[in-house]
Amino acid sequence: MSGGRFDFDDGGAYCGGWEGGKAHGHGLCTGPKGQGEYSGSWNFGFEVAGVYTWPSGNTFEGYWSQGKRHGLGIETKGRWLYKGEWTHGFKGRYGIRQSSSSGAKYEGTWNNGLQDGYGTETYADGGTYQGQFTNGMRHGYGVRQSVPYGMAVVVRSPLRTSLSSLRSEHSNGTVAPDSPASPASDGPALPSPAIPRGGFALSLLANAEAAARAPKGGGLFQRGALLGKLRRAESRTSVGSQRSRVSFLKSDLSSGASDAASTASLGEAAEGADEAAPFEADIDATTTETYMGEWKNDKRSGFGVSERSSGLRYEGEWLDNLRHGYGCTTLPDGHREEGKYRHNVLVKDTKRRMLQLKSNKVRQKVEHSVEGAQRAAAIARQKAEIAASRTSHAKAKAEAAEQAALAANQESNIARTLARELAPDFYQPGPEYQKRRLLQEILENSESLLEPPDRGAGAAGLPQPPRESPQLHERETPRPEGGSPSPAGTPPQPKRPRPGVSKDGLLSPGAWNGEPSGEGSRSVTPSEGAGRRSPARPATERMAIEALQAPPAPSREPEVALYQGYHSYAVRTTPPEPPPFEDQPEPEVSGSESAPSSPATAPLQAPTLRGPEPARETPAKLEPKPIIPKAEPRAKARKTEARGLTKAGAKKKARKEAALAAEAEVEVEEVPNTILICMVILLNIGLAILFVHLLT
């Protein structure tokens, strides 16, 4: 057997034993352009046992066959280490993959480089999952066991603390940069809708988001009838109504975070808070949680049982980590909630109804779901036992892989020694790659030590101190987007105080004249025009405008509040009296001054009250009569002025009578509405009594 150095056209080189024109014996080979290095034993051009080093510093130590990793070996890839069997270049059949930084690992069976079959996942906080896997995801039956609540990892990213590498990892073993858990991401992690803890899916805080998303049952009083003012009230006396708005099993995170299902999301108002079950803040630090049942695509879906050591338990159907379907929830105080769930919200319960047949059907479906959940839990326990046996077998293969790695390192050392003897100037890049990797790890570790405690804990997935655990779900949960605009809407009122704006936000007489209200009325332009023309008006007209700005009578406030239900703004039923125009010298001036006042009042009047408007134009047409005779004596002028004054007084009385008639019409219109409401209510009560009588 001869040996020496051989340079290839692609930039690679080989230095070692040679026979029959192929590499044979021991030797060292570099890849194209000198990238990558293999050192070990050869068999007529194919690797047998040795060490392959990538430019990133990742290594494989083990056996090869036909140019692919095959047999036993150890792969070091970033912070992850795989020890076990290899089949034609892929991980499997049995092996262990673990993280050198967090301690998370998977032990079980593999297929095509992904977890497939049975295995055990151990998470960074110590929680475990034992069961079935398919294509790298939990799929089938399995058991998820958490650690005590005080020790559980606070998951601040949608990816799981242990398995983020299995489905969102680069080839060099680093977490994807778009992941919030990536240590290379700049700035603090974005707050998630909830602060979940590993393995805890049960929650006793109200879930406003799911309650708003779940449609409620419709009825006669919910279809917009009776002006939309009557709604079906929800009972607060039964267990179902008190607990239906409570989110027991909330998890709105991605599939990668399903093992760390979220607890309560946004909280709820104080309504019924004192009557609800114990809050999440009261959970004991030693409480644990277990889920046994079906998994689909890495999520709790199908039938399953989830229970806590404190006594909280749910048996029934699941969908995407949410209670969805029929099931039964048992609270720590012994109360039971049975019925149909939709997105964690109870939409149908088994309490006594008028239609007993319907409630019996719901109860039968609940019993069927509970039986299915119990069967699924029993199957999951059996699958967990099988996974435990596969785990022990994978551990044995991992120990054998360690021995194979030692043999591969020995072959690599022999090949390096031979290469130095044959060609002392031959460059061996493998040691340089490993040195770079060690320096990079040292730098990353030093940076992680210099990071603030809160950021380091969020990025590395380390558990938070137990003292913060009970209040994390309440204090660190961000407010909903709809609750923050209050600061933006309140400042305009103290900045522009108007005497015509009431505390209730209704328009007062000052606003009827065109003044802008605190809510941003559109009558800003007419009010400015009126203010510019006010100096040119006579004293009598200014006095009339000041009279309109007086505070309204207490008896007319209910009218404004009543018509606010029909319109998006407050409306006064009685139109404001226009200023007198008798003293105007010319009819053209009076017409031009009366025009700007109409746009300010038109948007604020009810549509039914436009009838009396033509009466306002009559004074402008009749005013020129006392002005035409200019050459007559003063006595005749006095007579005409007296006649004009009497006519003006009569017109004022006519306008007042028209306004009173309009008010009477509005009152008459109000009475049929109340009568109609009362009649419909009495009719419904009578029909209900008749229906119950027929059933009994």
UniProtKB/Swiss-Prot annotation:
Region of interest (Disordered), ranges: 164-193, 250-282, 448-652
Gene3D superfamilies found in the cross-reference section: Histone H3 K4-specific methyltransferase SET7/9 N-terminal domain
Phenotype when changing residue 405 to S: In CMH17; uncertain significance
GO cellular component: endoplasmic reticulum membrane; junctional membrane complex; junctional sarcoplasmic reticulum membrane; nucleus; plasma membrane; sarcoplasmic reticulum; Z disc
Post-translational modification note: Phosphorylation on Ser-165, probably by PKC, affects RYR1-mediated calcium ion release, interaction with TRPC3, and skeletal muscle myotubule development.
Biological process per Gene Ontology, one example term: regulation of release of sequestered calcium ion into cytosol by sarcoplasmic reticulum
Name under which the protein is recorded: Junctophilin-2
Organism in which the protein naturally occurs: Homo sapiens (Human)
Gene: JPH2
